Regions:
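Conserved N-terminal beta-strand and adjoining loop/helix that marks the start
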Residues: 1-18, 88
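A generic structural micro-feature
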Residues: 2-4, 30, 77-83, 103-106
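Short connector loops at helix/strand junctions that flank enzyme active sites
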Residues: 5, 13, 33, 60, ...
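Conserved Nudix-box catalytic region and its N-terminal flanking loop in Nudix hydrolases
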Residues: 14-54
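Short loop segments at secondary-structure junctions
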Residues: 14-17, 24, 90-95, 114-116
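A short coil-to-beta-strand element that immediately follows conserved catalytic motifs
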Residues: 59-68
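Active-site-adjacent beta-strand/loop module that shapes the phosphate/pyrophosphate-binding cleft
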Residues: 73-97, 110, 133
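NUDIX/MutT-family hydrolases
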Residues: 88, 99-131
Length: 138
């Protein structure tokens, strides 16, 4: 049986910098773009808005589609194939992004200059590809 794991991520760009997160998933430290897993019955943009609200206490607006996985990537955690969808997003308010308290996998936020973004700084192969696309675009 084929099993797919759909992930949705946001590229929040401000002042020529993109937001990335450092997270603890299981016992692994992960560096990635903000976002997460699509839940059953949820659209991709709804998923991304939920993830930003839950993990970053931030409301966002979808600007445009940026990239969808176009190569095979097995999950690092289970026996599924990862399909990741990336959107460029913007905040809907001027409130500073703060990490919510409690059971939050996000441990740190960082703004990385687009011209200095390094694909090797990311954990997952799809994020590395997106970092390369961002770097080449700027």
């Amino acid at each position: 049986m084929l099993r797919f794991n759909v992930r949705v991520y946001g590229l929040l760009i401000h002042d020529e910098k993109v937001l990335i997160t450092d997270e603890l998933i299981g016992n692994k430290n992960i560096t990635k773009f903000p976002g997460g897993g699509l839940e059953y019955g949820e659209g991709t943009t709804d998923c991304l808005q939920r993830e930003f609200a839950e993990e970053l206490a931030t409301e966002i607006e979808i600007v445009n589609h940026f990239y969808t996985t176009d190569f095979f990537v097995p999950s690092a955690f289970d026996n599924t194939q990862i399909i990741s969808i990336y959107y460029q997003v913007k905040k809907t308010s001027n409130k500073e992004i703060k990490l919510p308290h409690g059971d939050n996998p996000v441990k740190n936020l960082r703004w990385i200059e687009l011209k200095k973004i390094n694909p090797d700084d990311f954990t997952f192969p799809i994020d590395k590809k997106v970092a390369e696309l961002l770097r080449n675009k700027n």
